């Protein structure tokens, strides 16, 4: 069996340290999408007031205190719907709240029958439906906006690799999937392929589209076992309803991908001063992999990934950078749909909120509002909504 470890572990409860992956299938091909020339931006954006400090105002708080309708153990997978409502995933829960924070329903029903699931990997709120993806059994479950079950669509993928739903548009679902890289010999840095899959809503037909390689440190074993530490990941967010804004490299590079055309329509970056990571703690060094009785700790990296997360709204793509200041917060770069570096600002939030802004899936941008998961010192969770006026 193969094990995959995120190199940078979250500082709150997560899934067990190792995620088991079955090593099957062939190595995904290179990024096939044809791109235009990379848009090169200077270190400073066009906005005259770039670099200002923005302090969001707390609008509301959702907690599990005083309710038996739901509980927060590890809320994640935050998504907003066109009506401003919020959805998220937790243990045996798919929770929906309206834009004012009022609890609507839990759509999770355990089982293998119609409308039932054993676990959920993603939820996709769209204009007329609310859709959840269950990896086991692999299917898409449709609900109306009132939370009533409508139907389900089996996803008959030939691969057993993990699939993550990214986007639904024009009758097609788009997923990210990955394969464990085939390697032999000493531990090494390798490309780990992440492919985009298109699944037809009408027929369930699956088509493999472009692949976006990420970087991983892989340990192999002559016995067939092995594992890897993810160094970069594919971060992809819906942009203008039908596109994906994404990044998958350690150095600064963003892309706008049209999955319907299977084509990168824009690549862009800006001059960026790279940030060194904090040294590994003794606890981190002791963690890692045990392969054939030998311990492998996470590799020491020279730099952090330049772009830690992506958010999008209207014609803007927000790149959450690795640049952080104790007094100012995190530096956010703002690009338009043409790849032009328009603006930048420091996002100043409580430290618990900033941790969620860095990690994909733990925050969601909806117009002037930012939903964020926060963990308090007493180990409890809350979801907060902030008004962000830039």
PLM feature spans:
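N-terminal secretory signal peptides that target proteins for export/translocation
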Residues: 1-10
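Sec-dependent N-terminal signal peptides
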Residues: 11-20
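Eukaryotic scaffold repeat domains enriched in small/polar residues
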Residues: 23-390
């Amino acid at each position: 069996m193969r094990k995959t470890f995120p190199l940078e572990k979250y500082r709150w409860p997560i899934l067990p340290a190792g995620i088991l992956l079955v090593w099957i299938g062939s190595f995904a091909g290179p990024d096939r999408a044809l791109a235009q020339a990379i848009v090169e931006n200077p270190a400073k954006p066009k906005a005259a007031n770039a670099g200002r400090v923005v302090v969001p105002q707390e609008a509301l708080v959702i907690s599990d205190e005083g309710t038996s309708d739901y509980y927060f153990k590890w809320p994640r997978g935050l998504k907003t719907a066109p009506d401003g409502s919020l959805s998220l995933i937790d243990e045996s829960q798919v929770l929906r709240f309206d834009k004012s924070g009022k609890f609507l329903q839990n759509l999770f029903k355990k089982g293998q029958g119609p409308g039932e699931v054993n676990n959920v990997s993603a939820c996709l709120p769209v204009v007329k439906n609310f859709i959840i993806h269950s990896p086991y059994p692999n299917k898409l479950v449709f609900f109306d906006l009132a939370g009533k079950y409508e139907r389900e669509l089996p996803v008959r993928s030939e691969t057993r690799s993990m699939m993550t739903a990214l986007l639904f548009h024009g009758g097609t679902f788009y997923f990210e999937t990955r394969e464990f890289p085939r390697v032999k010999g000493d531990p090494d840095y390798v490309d780990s392929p992440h492919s985009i899959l298109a699944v037809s809503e009408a027929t369930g037909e699956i088509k493999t589209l472009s692949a976006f390689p990420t970087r991983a440190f892989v340990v192999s074993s002559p016995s067939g076992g092995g594992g890897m530490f993810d160094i970069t990941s594919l971060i992809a967010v819906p942009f203008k309803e039908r596109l994906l804004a994404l990044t998958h490299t350690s150095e600064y590079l963003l892309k706008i991908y049209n999955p319907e055309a299977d084509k990168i329509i824009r690549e862009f970056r800006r001059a960026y001063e790279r940030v060194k990571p904090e040294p590994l703690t003794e606890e981190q060094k002791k963690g890692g992999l045990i392969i054939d009785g030998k311990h492998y700790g996470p590799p020491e990296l020279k730099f952090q990934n330049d772009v830690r997360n992506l958010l999008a709204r209207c014609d803007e793509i927000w790149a959450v950078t690795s640049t952080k200041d104790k007094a100012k917060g995190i530096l956010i770069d703002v690009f338009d749909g043409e790849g032009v570096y328009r603006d930048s600002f420091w996002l100043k939030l409580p430290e618990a909120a900033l941790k969620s802004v860095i990690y994909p899936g733990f925050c969601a941008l909806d117009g002037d509002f930012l939903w964020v998961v926060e963990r308090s010192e007493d180990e409890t969770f809350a979801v907060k909504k902030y008004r962000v006026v830039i």
